[in-house]
Amino acid sequence: MIFRTKADLDSHPCFNKKASASYGRVHLPVAPHCNIQCNFCNRIYDCANENRPGVTAKVQTPDESVKFLEKLFKFRQDISVIGIAGPGDPMCDADKTLATFEKCKSHFPNALLCLSTNGLALPEHVDEIVRLGVSHVTVTVNAVTPDVGSKVYSWVRYEGKNYYGEEAARILLARQDEGIRKLKEAGMLVKINTVVIPGVNIDHVQSISAKAKQWGADIMNCMAMIPVHDTPFENLKSPSTEEIHRIRRSIGGDIEQMTHCSRCRADACGKLGER
């Protein structure tokens, strides 16, 4: 791994609220495919107007991403982090994701590299992620028991086969557990993202935070589910701001809570709150 000082690592605006006032991030939308189907996601990522995770104006190739960054860094010196978060799952498109990080490591050695994933295809790539100098990884964990997971996920595609129900959730949870443990053993900074879904996992978040603490995760981000058209959860209400605040207060003793998330698009660029 590239040597980083604590000051370097602390300049990630998502992992450090103070840094978000001074530093921004850029997400490179190089990974369009996904290996799980969440019941709150319609997998339609080509959108220029919606401001939520999983959407982008276009998908870039690794080379297009480098050209974009070369132009960006000419007028944005406040971008400290290059991240890959979709619009699908970066580890489902591992070849594109890792090739992009390889190019970024070579062309922009001072930038922090960041990855966001559901964790299903994470374990087998941890060594390569470390080699490429990725320092911050976010894993989205919406359940830590198969019964709850079976309500969140429609299916999981693992080793070329689709799995459903509790079997699917059990596979995903085992892979997340293995991947996160490997990340922490490698010295990575790890954030756990949890989509809070009323009537599904809202009363389960405390169990997720306890597991995150057990993993040694560094910070947790509880995000309100956004109802999306043409999904199984399209008619569910998004949890209120007060409900999210209550959850954060109740689990803050387990693990530090991120309170400044802007639920970034897969092509987000700038400080949090900017597109």
Question: Which residues does each predicted region cover?
Answer:
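N-terminal [4Fe-4S]-dependent radical SAM core
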Residues: 1-29, 34, 43-59, 71, ...
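Conserved N-terminal glycine/acidic-rich loop preference
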Residues: 6-18, 22, 69-85, 90, ...
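Conserved functional loop/turn residues at catalytic and ligand-binding sites
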Residues: 33, 37, 42, 133, ...
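Short glycine-enriched, charge-decorated loop/helix-capping segments at active-site entrances
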Residues: 52-57, 153-156, 165-166, 234-238
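Active-site mouth loops of central-metabolism enzymes
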Residues: 54-62, 197-202
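A structural signal for short coil/turn segments at secondary-structure junctions
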Residues: 76-77, 108, 187, 255
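Conserved AdoMet/S-adenosylmethionine-binding subsite of the radical SAM
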Residues: 91-223, 228
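C-terminal accessory regions of radical SAM enzymes
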Residues: 239-275
